A protein has these predicted regions:
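A short, structured active-site edge motif that brings together acidic residues
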Residues: 1-9, 100-102
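Outer-envelope exported proteins of Gram-negative bacteria
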Residues: 2, 41-43, 74
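Short, small-residue-rich loop/turn micro-motifs
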Residues: 3-5, 38, 46, 130, ...
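Active-site mouth loops of central-metabolism enzymes
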Residues: 9-24, 45-51
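Short, acidic/polar
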Residues: 17-35, 58, 82-87
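Residues in well-ordered alpha-helical elements
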Residues: 21, 37-40, 54, 189
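Active-site groove signature of glycoside hydrolases
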Residues: 31-52
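Beta/alpha (TIM)-barrel catalytic core signal, keyed to glycine-rich beta->alpha loops juxtaposed to Asp/Glu
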Residues: 51-212
């Protein structure tokens, strides 16, 4: 069981962020909504620059000590955000982030520049979100073809910006995936996902699904 905190859950000033007040309240609310007595991995959805890192980590360590949270993780941190958090946790003997959730795909590989080496060095696992680049690597997007009408990109709700990479780069990648697909009898999406699962530090990928 995994869930997140930090992003707004209401309009009140204490209904968002990574302050001690909000994290403890958010955890209790999540436990109630999930109808469970513990959270296996509790993610900070983003770095809260308005709250001292010490306050955030102490609150999370208290949640771990209480048994309500087993492990803590973070999401969308920069390299210095993550390294500062790990350093402070080590200094005080508090629980450390065991995993970092990031955007990473064959189309966008910036994760490899800094965060992957950091993960290797500090033994931090990686959970990848949008591994198919908001569907761009699903096999539905083809050179000289229209964007699928019901796609998130067409609707403007994609978590990966439309200009995340030049179109020619996308189609060049898809062309190669098509070749491998024919050779292996696997889908373009399967190949793109399998590539990610073989990458250093990647322990899990998050695949979205339609609700229809």
């Amino acid at each position: 069981i995994s869930t997140k905190a930090t992003f707004p859950m209401g309009k009140d000033v204490n209904a968002y962020g990574s302050s001690r007040f909000h994290l403890i309240e958010a955890c209790e609310n999540s436990l109630r909504r999930l109808n469970t007595d513990h959270i296996d991995v509790y993610h900070m959805h983003g770095f809260d620059g308005s709250t001292p890192v010490e306050e955030t980590l102490r609150a999370l360590d208290d949640l771990v000590t209480s048994g309500k949270v087993r492990y803590i993780a973070c999401s969308n941190f920069s390299g210095w955000h993550l390294m500062k958090s790990l350093s402070i946790a080590e200094k005080y003997g508090w629980s450390k982030y065991i995993s970092h959730q990031v955007y990473y795909s064959l189309l966008n590989r910036e994760f490899e520049w800094e965060l992957m080496p950091l993960g290797i060095d500090q033994k931090i696992g990686t959970m990848v979100w949008s591994p198919l680049a908001s569907g761009r690597l699903s096999g539905k997007y083809r050179r000289n073809s229209a964007i699928p009408e019901k796609s998130r990109i067409a609707a403007g709700t994609s978590t990966v910006p439309k200009d995340a990479a030049p179109e020619e780069r996308l189609y060049a990648i898809v062309d190669v995936l098509d070749e491998i697909s024919r050779e292996t009898d696997k889908s373009v999406a399967q190949i793109a996902l399998n590539w990610l699962l073989q990458r250093p530090t990647v322990s899990s990928i998050i695949v979205g699904a339609r609700t229809e």
